[in-house]
Amino acid sequence: MRFVAGEYDVCVVGLGHAGSEAALASARLGLSTVGFATNLDAIALMACNPSIGGPAKAQLVREIDALGGQMAINTDKSLLQMRTLNTSKGPAVRSLRAQVDKKLYQMNMKHTLERQENLDIKQAEIVDILVEDNKVTGVVTKLGAIYKCKACIITTGTFLKGRVIIGEVDFESGPSGLFPASELSEALKRLGFKLMRFKTGTPPRVDKRSIDFSKMEIQPGDEVITPFSFMHDKIEIEQMPCWLTYTNEKTHKIIRDNIHRAPLFTGAITGVGVRYCPSIEDKVVKFPHRERHQIFIEPEGRDTYEMYVQGMSSSLPEDVQLEFLRTVPGLENVRVMRPAYAIEYDCIDPTQLKATLESKWIEGLYFAGQVNGTSGYEEAAAQGLMAGINAAMKILNKPPVVLDRSQAYIGILIDDLVTKGTNEPYRMLTSRAEYRLLLRQDNADFRLTEIGKEIGLVTEERYEKFLRKKIQLEKEMRRLSTVMVRPTEEVNNFLISRGSTPLVSGVDLYTLLKRPEVDYKSTKFLDPDRPDDILDSVAEQIDINIKYEGYILKQLRQVEQFKAMENKKIPEDIDYYQISGLSNEAKEKLSKIRPTSVGQASRISGVSPADISVLLIYLQQMRKKKSNESRIS
């Protein structure tokens, strides 16, 4: 029997990485919010790797932080190790990667949710979404409780009709042995949503005490930790190392000899898997000439012996897993604490959503995270934040917040999903960003904190900290162009020692810093009036802004062209089938996606440059016609 148990502005279904950010954003914007999890002990569960960040993902985490989200703060609080990746490459692809204590991360996030004003969290499985006149009105729990709401955000991760597969064995399950959510899938189908079936997997967890680390290469963290959150100036902890080892021909032979037992190849797995995170059996089959594959052994926490075997995701039977693990140097006597498994789950086709992550036909119903076909904690958290913001904006009768591709990786992520869709679990990559030199992890605050302040998520403390940094950077950039450096013996010896050409005549320090061999910090002795309180983050910005000035200006000009196309808006009620000259495929795709701008239309697969030219002419004719009609009237 159903009964009304409560009424809120916003209901969030699922409290993983997407749901946690969505619930916090909504509550922090003043809306009464309730978040549901099938198990409150699994809030912000890190069901797979014990890490946050990496290429493109670190940029997402920094953007979440700059807008006022929680992930970066929580990562810093739960840190085991921090490494900066791609240090030998350009700033566009440099990325932080944090090893975190899984349980501490969960505990910190749960504590944050519990303390948040305007937010209740409840343990319940949601089995139905209530809709009247194409508007969300509430949700229903398995026990029959109805919670009325004005907006609902679905953030169910990999729980929808979850099925775990290990060799010949399969059973209904969510990740990490949790219950799946099967009834909500059927409810979404009844509401008209097209569902897809995706697959992901996770490697074994092994007992640290059974590992011989002397046969592995140690992977320490950075000597000086760079925090993920712009709110933190420094972090001082005792870091835990990771370890590197490799598979070998013995490993590969065992896998090949048992490939007939691999669900991936027997047809037992029907879901589409993650391209950029293949299982070990997939790697052995697809790359038969590779003599070895990297395996990283990563700690799962300070107070556990469990170690994560990165690079060995598998759905092979448990006995085969143990056999191939014990061929790896250092793992000869390994004890498995949790076997690897694959998990299949339902997700929606994200082209059914607007750029706000709201359903195109059910008002107030939003989706975020892996339910939208993405993979990764960071991608989920980014979507959750934006869904929470936009659900709140709608209820508050404020304009929606949509970041474009020139503003943030978050904008690229969502635009790709709603414009192109995905036929496999979507992972954010730096190669997806057209303007990646502008969208660096180091400048996320300069790009987005003002927007976060306008939304209402950025606190006064964060904003004041940002303004101090911004003013310091602007002042120092101006001052450097007034500092003259003479071609003295000391100066030229310094330049020669750096592998740089000696000066023949005087030059300002701003110009000197354009040289790749010279950096801001090393030139302090040339600059006696330099302020002593320059932040490390400001010094980094100075070097990047000066050295890459030409490339940055070039990308800014490209952004102007991009914005011009984005600003050419398309009426919501346009009938593409009435536009002569459009290809049939373009008519079909444009009618399905309903792009809001010519720029978005140009990114739809199957819409050619010729179709865009026809569309531009049609829109111009429409504007002229309306202009003439308004003059006549």
From Swiss-Prot:
GO terms for molecular function: flavin adenine dinucleotide binding. It comes from the Bacteria. InterPro entries: FAD/NAD-bd_sf (IPR036188), GIDA_C_N (IPR049312), MnmG (IPR004416), MnmG-rel (IPR002218), MnmG-rel_CS (IPR020595), MnmG_C (IPR026904), MnmG_C_subdom (IPR047001), MnmG_C_subdom_sf (IPR044920). Keywords: Cytoplasm, FAD, Flavoprotein, NAD, tRNA processing. FAD binds at residues 14-19. One of its GO terms (biological process) is tRNA methylation. Its cofactor is FAD. HAMAP family: MnmG_GidA. Belongs to the MnmG family. NAD-binding protein involved in the addition of a carboxymethylaminomethyl (cmnm) group at the wobble position (U34) of certain tRNAs, forming tRNA-cmnm(5)s(2)U34. This is tRNA uridine 5-carboxymethylaminomethyl modification enzyme MnmG 1.
